[in-house]
Protein backbone atom coordinates (compact mmCIF):
# COMPACT_ATOMS: atom_id res chain seq x y z
CA UNK A 1 0.00 0.00 0.00
CA UNK A 2 1.49 3.31 -1.05
CA UNK A 3 1.96 6.15 1.39
CA UNK A 4 -0.47 8.99 0.60
CA UNK A 5 0.93 12.48 0.11
CA UNK A 6 -1.04 15.59 1.03
CA UNK A 7 -0.25 18.63 -1.10
CA UNK A 8 0.03 22.22 0.09
CA UNK A 9 2.01 23.63 -2.79
CA UNK A 10 3.69 27.01 -2.83
CA UNK A 11 1.98 29.64 -4.97
CA UNK A 12 3.40 30.05 -8.47
CA UNK A 13 3.80 33.72 -7.58
CA UNK A 14 6.60 32.64 -5.20
CA UNK A 15 8.41 30.32 -7.62
CA UNK A 16 11.10 32.95 -8.22
CA UNK A 17 11.91 32.89 -4.50
CA UNK A 18 11.34 29.27 -3.53
CA UNK A 19 11.86 27.11 -6.63
CA UNK A 20 12.98 29.19 -9.63
CA UNK A 21 14.46 26.42 -11.76
CA UNK A 22 13.02 23.46 -13.62
CA UNK A 23 14.40 20.20 -12.23
CA UNK A 24 14.86 16.61 -13.32
CA UNK A 25 15.80 15.04 -10.00
CA UNK A 26 18.70 12.62 -9.64
CA UNK A 27 18.91 12.31 -5.85
CA UNK A 28 16.91 12.37 -2.62
CA UNK A 29 18.33 14.38 0.29
CA UNK A 30 17.35 13.70 3.90
CA UNK A 31 17.17 16.43 6.55
CA UNK A 32 16.13 16.81 10.20
CA UNK A 33 14.04 19.91 10.89
CA UNK A 34 15.85 20.79 14.16
CA UNK A 35 12.52 21.83 15.70
CA UNK A 36 9.37 20.13 16.99
CA UNK A 37 6.80 21.39 14.48
CA UNK A 38 4.44 19.05 12.63
CA UNK A 39 4.72 18.40 8.90
CA UNK A 40 1.71 20.63 8.24
CA UNK A 41 3.27 23.49 10.17
CA UNK A 42 6.66 22.99 8.50
CA UNK A 43 5.18 23.25 5.03
CA UNK A 44 2.87 26.14 5.90
CA UNK A 45 5.78 28.10 7.34
CA UNK A 46 8.05 27.30 4.40
CA UNK A 47 5.62 28.36 1.70
CA UNK A 48 4.43 31.42 3.63
CA UNK A 49 7.66 33.11 4.69
CA UNK A 50 9.97 35.40 2.72
CA UNK A 51 13.11 33.27 3.00
CA UNK A 52 14.34 31.42 -0.07
CA UNK A 53 14.90 28.23 1.96
CA UNK A 54 12.64 25.51 0.63
CA UNK A 55 12.13 21.75 0.42
CA UNK A 56 9.77 19.34 -1.26
CA UNK A 57 8.37 17.18 1.57
CA UNK A 58 7.93 17.23 5.34
CA UNK A 59 7.25 13.96 7.18
CA UNK A 60 5.98 13.62 10.73
CA UNK A 61 4.61 10.71 12.74
CA UNK A 62 1.25 10.83 10.96
CA UNK A 63 1.62 12.06 7.39
CA UNK A 64 3.68 13.25 4.44
CA UNK A 65 3.01 16.74 3.09
CA UNK A 66 4.39 18.17 -0.15
CA UNK A 67 5.19 21.87 -0.49
CA UNK A 68 6.96 22.12 -3.86
CA UNK A 69 6.36 20.47 -7.25
CA UNK A 70 8.88 17.74 -8.01
CA UNK A 71 9.74 19.35 -11.34
CA UNK A 72 11.06 22.47 -9.56
CA UNK A 73 14.28 22.79 -7.58
CA UNK A 74 14.49 23.65 -3.89
CA UNK A 75 17.04 25.62 -1.87
CA UNK A 76 17.80 23.09 0.84
CA UNK A 77 21.38 21.81 0.66
CA UNK A 78 23.59 24.89 0.87
CA UNK A 79 25.82 23.97 -2.08
CA UNK A 80 25.16 27.10 -4.10
CA UNK A 81 22.99 28.28 -6.95
CA UNK A 82 24.15 25.57 -9.32
CA UNK A 83 25.11 22.85 -6.84
CA UNK A 84 23.68 19.38 -7.56
CA UNK A 85 22.07 19.19 -4.12
CA UNK A 86 20.04 22.34 -4.69
CA UNK A 87 19.44 21.76 -8.38
CA UNK A 88 19.00 18.01 -8.70
CA UNK A 89 17.77 16.57 -5.40
CA UNK A 90 14.39 16.08 -3.75
CA UNK A 91 14.40 17.46 -0.21
CA UNK A 92 12.75 15.41 2.57
CA UNK A 93 12.53 16.93 6.06
CA UNK A 94 11.94 14.62 9.06
CA UNK A 95 10.00 16.40 11.80
CA UNK A 96 10.25 16.46 15.62
CA UNK A 97 14.03 16.03 15.59
CA UNK A 98 14.78 18.67 18.25
CA UNK A 99 13.37 16.69 21.18
CA UNK A 100 13.38 13.22 19.65
CA UNK A 101 11.41 10.53 21.45
CA UNK A 102 8.54 8.37 20.17
CA UNK A 103 7.10 11.02 17.83
CA UNK A 104 10.43 11.54 16.12
CA UNK A 105 11.05 7.79 15.92
CA UNK A 106 7.66 7.34 14.24
CA UNK A 107 8.40 10.24 11.87
CA UNK A 108 11.75 8.74 10.94
CA UNK A 109 10.16 5.33 10.34
CA UNK A 110 7.54 6.88 8.05
CA UNK A 111 10.25 8.86 6.24
CA UNK A 112 12.25 5.69 5.67
CA UNK A 113 9.23 4.03 4.07
CA UNK A 114 8.44 7.15 2.06
CA UNK A 115 11.97 7.55 0.70
CA UNK A 116 11.91 3.88 -0.30
CA UNK A 117 8.63 4.59 -2.09
CA UNK A 118 10.18 7.53 -3.97
CA UNK A 119 13.08 5.29 -5.00
CA UNK A 120 10.75 2.55 -6.21
CA UNK A 121 8.66 4.99 -8.22
CA UNK A 122 11.77 6.14 -10.07
CA UNK A 123 13.52 2.80 -10.42
CA UNK A 124 16.40 4.11 -8.31
CA UNK A 125 18.68 2.31 -5.88
CA UNK A 126 19.98 3.35 -2.46
CA UNK A 127 22.93 5.08 -4.15
CA UNK A 128 20.56 7.98 -4.93
CA UNK A 129 20.04 8.81 -1.23
CA UNK A 130 22.11 11.59 0.33
CA UNK A 131 22.21 13.47 3.62
CA UNK A 132 22.36 17.28 3.75
CA UNK A 133 25.90 17.03 5.08
CA UNK A 134 27.08 15.37 1.86
CA UNK A 135 26.41 18.51 -0.17
CA UNK A 136 27.71 21.34 2.00
CA UNK A 137 29.12 19.90 5.21
CA UNK A 138 26.24 21.12 7.40
CA UNK A 139 25.61 18.86 10.40
CA UNK A 140 22.26 17.66 9.13
CA UNK A 141 20.27 15.44 9.64
CA UNK A 142 21.51 16.39 13.11
CA UNK A 143 19.75 13.75 15.22
CA UNK A 144 20.64 10.88 12.92
CA UNK A 145 24.26 12.05 12.81
CA UNK A 146 24.59 12.70 16.55
CA UNK A 147 23.29 9.20 17.27
CA UNK A 148 25.67 7.69 14.72
CA UNK A 149 22.85 6.15 12.73
CA UNK A 150 23.23 7.35 9.14
CA UNK A 151 24.40 3.94 7.92
CA UNK A 152 21.53 2.36 9.82
CA UNK A 153 18.95 4.67 8.25
CA UNK A 154 20.29 3.99 4.76
CA UNK A 155 20.27 0.27 5.47
CA UNK A 156 16.64 0.50 6.64
CA UNK A 157 15.67 2.35 3.45
CA UNK A 158 17.46 -0.26 1.36
CA UNK A 159 15.79 -3.12 3.23
CA UNK A 160 12.40 -1.49 2.68
CA UNK A 161 13.20 -1.00 -0.99
CA UNK A 162 14.49 -4.51 -1.54
CA UNK A 163 11.92 -6.12 0.72
CA UNK A 164 9.07 -4.82 -1.39
CA UNK A 165 10.68 -6.21 -4.51
CA UNK A 166 11.45 -9.54 -2.88
CA UNK A 167 8.01 -10.05 -1.39
CA UNK A 168 6.02 -9.15 -4.47
CA UNK A 169 8.19 -9.87 -7.46
CA UNK A 170 10.90 -12.44 -6.81
CA UNK A 171 9.19 -15.53 -8.17
CA UNK A 172 12.21 -17.80 -8.05
CA UNK A 173 13.30 -20.46 -5.56
CA UNK A 174 16.50 -20.37 -3.56
CA UNK A 175 18.09 -22.74 -6.06
CA UNK A 176 16.99 -20.83 -9.17
CA UNK A 177 19.58 -19.45 -11.59
CA UNK A 178 17.40 -17.08 -13.62
CA UNK A 179 14.66 -14.51 -13.12
CA UNK A 180 11.83 -13.41 -15.44
CA UNK A 181 11.30 -9.65 -15.44
CA UNK A 182 7.84 -8.49 -14.35
CA UNK A 183 6.05 -5.16 -14.61
CA UNK A 184 7.66 -2.60 -12.32
CA UNK A 185 10.94 -4.47 -11.91
CA UNK A 186 14.27 -2.65 -12.02
CA UNK A 187 17.67 -4.22 -12.46
CA UNK A 188 18.85 -2.71 -9.17
CA UNK A 189 15.85 -4.23 -7.37
CA UNK A 190 16.43 -7.66 -8.93
CA UNK A 191 20.12 -7.48 -8.04
CA UNK A 192 19.48 -6.51 -4.43
CA UNK A 193 16.80 -9.16 -3.84
CA UNK A 194 19.15 -11.89 -5.06
CA UNK A 195 22.33 -10.75 -3.36
CA UNK A 196 24.07 -9.66 -6.55
CA UNK A 197 25.41 -6.36 -7.85
CA UNK A 198 23.95 -4.47 -10.80
CA UNK A 199 27.34 -4.61 -12.54
CA UNK A 200 27.44 -8.40 -12.18
CA UNK A 201 23.98 -8.78 -13.71
CA UNK A 202 24.92 -6.41 -16.52
CA UNK A 203 28.04 -8.42 -17.25
CA UNK A 204 26.55 -11.92 -17.31
CA UNK A 205 23.45 -10.75 -19.20
CA UNK A 206 25.24 -8.40 -21.63
CA UNK A 207 23.06 -5.47 -20.55
CA UNK A 208 24.48 -2.13 -21.69
CA UNK A 209 21.94 0.18 -20.05
CA UNK A 210 20.76 -0.98 -16.58
CA UNK A 211 17.73 1.33 -16.84
CA UNK A 212 16.31 -0.57 -19.81
CA UNK A 213 15.02 -4.07 -19.16
CA UNK A 214 11.83 -5.54 -20.65
CA UNK A 215 8.90 -7.40 -19.16
CA UNK A 216 9.45 -11.11 -19.76
CA UNK A 217 13.20 -10.72 -20.21
CA UNK A 218 15.18 -13.57 -18.66
CA UNK A 219 17.89 -12.39 -16.28
CA UNK A 220 20.61 -14.91 -15.48
CA UNK A 221 21.66 -14.93 -11.83
CA UNK A 222 25.08 -15.73 -10.36
CA UNK A 223 25.16 -19.29 -9.03
CA UNK A 224 25.60 -18.22 -5.40
CA UNK A 225 23.41 -15.12 -5.41
CA UNK A 226 20.00 -16.63 -4.73
CA UNK A 227 21.29 -18.51 -1.69
CA UNK A 228 22.96 -15.49 -0.10
CA UNK A 229 20.05 -14.38 2.05
CA UNK A 230 19.60 -17.76 3.76
CA UNK A 231 23.35 -17.93 4.26
CA UNK A 232 23.34 -14.49 5.87
CA UNK A 233 20.54 -15.48 8.25
CA UNK A 234 22.31 -18.69 9.26
CA UNK A 235 25.47 -16.68 9.95
CA UNK A 236 23.68 -14.78 12.73
CA UNK A 237 21.83 -17.27 14.97
CA UNK A 238 19.45 -15.61 17.40
CA UNK A 239 18.31 -16.88 20.81
CA UNK A 240 14.75 -17.62 21.84
CA UNK A 241 13.05 -16.06 24.84
CA UNK A 242 12.98 -12.53 26.21
CA UNK A 243 16.00 -10.39 27.09
CA UNK A 244 15.74 -6.97 28.71
CA UNK A 245 17.64 -4.66 31.01
CA UNK A 246 17.72 -6.21 34.49
CA UNK A 247 19.59 -5.71 37.75
CA UNK A 248 22.15 -7.18 37.67
CA UNK A 249 22.52 -6.91 33.88
CA UNK A 250 21.94 -10.04 31.79
CA UNK A 251 25.17 -11.31 30.27
CA UNK A 252 26.36 -14.16 28.09
CA UNK A 253 26.35 -15.79 24.68
CA UNK A 254 22.68 -15.10 23.97
CA UNK A 255 23.17 -11.39 24.49
CA UNK A 256 26.24 -11.39 22.25
CA UNK A 257 24.22 -13.14 19.51
CA UNK A 258 21.61 -10.38 19.65
CA UNK A 259 24.28 -7.67 19.62
CA UNK A 260 26.15 -9.26 16.71
CA UNK A 261 22.96 -9.45 14.63
CA UNK A 262 22.09 -5.85 15.48
CA UNK A 263 25.53 -4.70 14.35
CA UNK A 264 25.12 -6.67 11.10
CA UNK A 265 21.93 -4.68 10.50
CA UNK A 266 23.78 -1.39 11.30
CA UNK A 267 22.05 -0.93 14.67
CA UNK A 268 25.24 -0.75 16.71
CA UNK A 269 24.95 -1.00 20.52
CA UNK A 270 27.83 1.50 20.77
CA UNK A 271 29.44 2.37 17.44
CA UNK A 272 32.37 4.21 18.99
CA UNK A 273 33.31 1.42 21.39
CA UNK A 274 35.42 -1.69 20.87
CA UNK A 275 33.62 -4.18 18.58
CA UNK A 276 30.83 -1.57 18.19
CA UNK A 277 29.66 -2.38 21.72
CA UNK A 278 29.27 -6.13 21.16
CA UNK A 279 30.31 -7.17 24.67
CA UNK A 280 27.74 -9.75 25.78
CA UNK A 281 26.09 -7.39 28.28
CA UNK A 282 22.44 -6.34 27.81
CA UNK A 283 22.68 -2.81 29.15
CA UNK A 284 20.96 0.48 28.25
CA UNK A 285 22.95 0.93 25.02
CA UNK A 286 22.00 -2.51 23.72
CA UNK A 287 18.38 -1.89 24.72
CA UNK A 288 18.56 1.40 22.82
CA UNK A 289 19.87 -0.39 19.72
CA UNK A 290 16.97 -2.86 19.97
CA UNK A 291 14.55 0.04 20.42
CA UNK A 292 15.92 1.81 17.34
CA UNK A 293 15.58 -1.36 15.31
CA UNK A 294 12.02 -1.85 16.54
CA UNK A 295 11.06 1.74 15.75
CA UNK A 296 11.91 1.39 12.05
CA UNK A 297 10.50 -2.14 11.79
CA UNK A 298 6.88 -1.57 12.77
CA UNK A 299 7.31 -3.06 16.25
CA UNK A 300 6.59 -1.69 19.71
CA UNK A 301 9.74 0.26 20.51
CA UNK A 302 10.35 -0.87 24.09
CA UNK A 303 13.97 -2.04 23.89
CA UNK A 304 13.02 -5.56 24.94
CA UNK A 305 14.25 -8.43 22.75
CA UNK A 306 11.55 -11.07 22.28
CA UNK A 307 9.92 -13.38 19.70
CA UNK A 308 8.58 -10.59 17.46
CA UNK A 309 11.89 -8.74 17.43
CA UNK A 310 13.73 -11.99 16.75
CA UNK A 311 11.44 -12.79 13.79
CA UNK A 312 11.85 -9.31 12.32
CA UNK A 313 15.64 -9.43 12.70
CA UNK A 314 15.77 -12.84 10.99
CA UNK A 315 13.64 -11.44 8.18
CA UNK A 316 16.03 -8.55 7.61
CA UNK A 317 19.33 -10.43 7.94
UniProtKB/Swiss-Prot annotation:
SMART domains according to UniProt: Ami_2, LysM
Keywords in alphabetical order: Cell wall biogenesis/degradation, Competence, Hydrolase, Secreted, Signal, Sporulation
Signal peptide: 1-39
GO biological process, alphabetically ordered: cell wall organization; establishment of competence for transformation; peptidoglycan catabolic process; peptidoglycan turnover; sporulation resulting in formation of a cellular spore
Function: Autolysins are involved in some important biological processes such as cell separation, cell-wall turnover, competence for genetic transformation, formation of the flagella and sporulation.
InterPro entries in UniProt: Amidase/PGRP_sf (IPR036505), Amidase_domain (IPR002502), LysM_dom (IPR018392), LysM_dom_sf (IPR036779), NAMLAA_amidase_2 (IPR051206), Peptidoglycan-bd-like (IPR002477), PGBD-like_sf (IPR036365), PGBDSf (IPR036366)
Name by which UniProt lists this protein: N-acetylmuramoyl-L-alanine amidase XlyB
Record-level GO cellular component terms: extracellular region
Keyword Zinc: no
Encoding gene per record: xlyB
Subcellular location: Secreted
Reactions mediated catalytically: Hydrolyzes the link between N-acetylmuramoyl residues and L-amino acid residues in certain cell-wall glycopeptides
CDD domains: LysM (cd00118), PGRP (cd06583)
N-acetylmuramoyl-L-alanine amidase domain mapped to chain residues: 40-142
Keyword Cell wall biogenesis/degradation: yes
Amino acid sequence: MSIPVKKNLVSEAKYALKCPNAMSAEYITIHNTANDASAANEISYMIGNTSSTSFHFAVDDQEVIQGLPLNRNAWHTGDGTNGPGNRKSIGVEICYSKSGGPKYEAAEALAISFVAQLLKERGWGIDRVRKHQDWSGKYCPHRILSEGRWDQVKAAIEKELNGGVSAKKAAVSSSASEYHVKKGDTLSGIAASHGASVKTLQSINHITDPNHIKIGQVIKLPQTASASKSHAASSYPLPSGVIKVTSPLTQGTKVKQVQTALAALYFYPDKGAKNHGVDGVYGPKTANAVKRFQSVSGLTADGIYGPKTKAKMEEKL
